[in-house]
Amino acid sequence: MDENLTDTQAEETFRDIQGALNNMMTSSLQYFPPFISCVQNVCYNEGKLSLEAGKVTTISIGSLQQPIGIMLLEKQILRISEDPGERPTKRQRTSASPSRETTTTWIELSKLYKSIEDFDVLRGIFSSQIGTQAITRQALEAEGRGDYTKALKLYSQSSEGDALQVEVDLWDDSILECCKRLTLWDKMEESCLVDVDEKDGVVDLDQMWRDEYFKEHYLPFLLRSKTKQFCSGKHDDQFLNFISNSLKDEQQKAYLENKFSDILALLFILQDDYDRARYYTGSCLQTFLEDWSGLDSMMTSSRSAQLQSLQALTEMQEFLDFISNEGNFSTTSSTTSLLKRWSSREPDPKLHSVDIWDDVMTNRSVYLDKILLKFNKSSQLLNSEDSMDCSINTEQLENNFMKKRVMFSLRLAEVATGQVNFPVAKRQLQNSLHLIRDRLKNDRELEILWTHTYSDLNCKKCLILAPLEAIDTAISAIEQLDKVKDIKLLQEDLSTGVRHHLLKSSSLDTITNVLGINGTWDSLDSSLKEKLRALYFGKQADQLDKVISQIATKSFTTLQLAVKIAQSNENNLKTSDSRKKLVTSLMTMTNFCDRLLRLKEEDNEQTPKLDMKMFPGIVIRYVLKSMSYESTEARQKFPRLLQLVELHPGSDVEAFKRKSSDVPCWMFISWINQMVALLDKRESRAVHGILEDLAKHYPQALLYPLKISREQFKFGGSIEEQENKQFVERLNGTLSFPMLDDLIIALEQLTNPDMVFK
């Protein structure tokens, strides 16, 4: 181009191309990944072309092509900084604020990193001087920690002042994102409509179409919030009319169908229009397949994000297939099969955020309501025809569905607790408790499940609370657990009984840990001290060490109960859940004992005054037993057993030898070096059996560590030491690999070539 055109013509041509590219990005409805990636690659490779930073962010997030968008914006930032008109003088470099264009590009870049949840990079961006307010960095840090409540508060407090419009837009988007993570749908709706004008005293929703910014930023969240509230029973005719009118306009209809087919499908399900719902579900699945085919296999984060919506879509399709088949409503067997299928699959508790879980669980509740309504209609029809085949108990079915809804809610609370999203967990617990008490007449099984979820939430919350509040919260959890301790289900269901005692022990441990913080005991009032005394049924105690010791003793005995219950069915561990509960109880007891042993070894002042003679043996036996059940945590703890064998010789060595024989020898391969290092010690007989098995089954894994360590061994003249020496010689004799010996000699010569000539 430079050869055929003058400079002016070339500049005009580049300007036309750049305008055309920006126009293509602006007018795109589908954000087809290959097309978006192609345009961005052209701009990245051709230095004279650039796209608007805001448009790069929008299309990159919409097409899940964040990596190329990040590269493009970073290159544009470098280009701006290299512009002679942008570079400050030496005197200005330390004080001058960046230009408006630079700040805008940095903020748009931060949006891309935020969309892939790379908060480490975000922290780096906002820790430098990019022309933004300090409160933006503080709010983003809170988001990165998962503290969406604090982040929402900070974003809401931020004042526009001297902030650029792009930073204000970042605050608006972040407020909506925090509302989504906290499932605050009414707050989300309020934030979407705060700047929308009113018409005849009613919010003018049509402004969402007239204003391009509103359409891109507010419309997606408005649709989501209104639909979620519709699912919970809040009917809004104005919103439904808005959707109906929008679908009559060809451009608006195309926009909604391309981007929000899943929401449209759910809306029509809520209105019992299953044919239109089926159409939009099929459209959504087709769009998913097209987008998936356009994502490179190396873009793991984008593919993972794309997959997050698949379960909700699949279950929507299953529901529509189920509801359209009249044969499914003659008996409850098909419904039972559907519920089992749903119960067997769920989003990942760690990879999928709470709002994804909320989508799945809320949709399931809607489907159950619709299925129950269809059963009621079928039952009434059969009754009106005086049919003798009407054997469906709709009241019992409604009760079962209500139990499922409570279990969905409690599962969501568990996931939210695991993701440190405590406000969502608390709200789900409140909703489920209302259903248990009012609709299910205090169902005992669900009451225990609710109590365990509540106690788990309180234990996790204690980690971020002030000492006094943490103690009060832990005591509240223990009191709630004690309310259900006499229910028969705890004795009949081993898994439930184990979890009950583990949660109580965890709450007691929380109290002892908090009491160990300097100044906590002195700041407690008399009522709180009385509550602590009631935990272990002790007398009035004013000495901190006695209180800690008593509570630690109570925690230990509680763990013993958990282990006893878990081991009571050890010979019949058929399910993975029962094996998992056994390993969990064993490792919890192990960690408890090991923590106190370490405090004692360190001469810590806050070490509880307990008889710890049994603790080394408990750690050794329980770790090795957990290893026999293929516990990864136990395998990683094995070196600690070798240390305990050295520190506590005697009967513990015999326990080590006996229990280690039940563990597959391959599980010890990672720790061969540590075991070989013990061979000239008195306690080496503990690992003789393990090393013999390794020499028999995996000799090459043992060869190098033994060859290296053998030169450093020093054996004394005692009987035990001579026996150890004989064992080493016998072990070395079994590892006969002439070719490997020659290789080792050759490697030694390479390492010390001067030795060859001496």
Which residues does each PLM region occupy?
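Single-residue signature of alpha-solenoid repeat helices
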Residues: 122, 151, 188, 239, ...
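TPR repeat positional signature
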Residues: 52-57, 106, 135, 172, ...
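Alpha-solenoid helical repeat scaffolds
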Residues: 37-40, 54, 74-75, 127, ...
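Extended repeat-based interaction scaffolds and adjacent low-complexity, acidic/S/T/P-biased segments
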Residues: 1-162, 166-171, 175-189, 193-212, ...
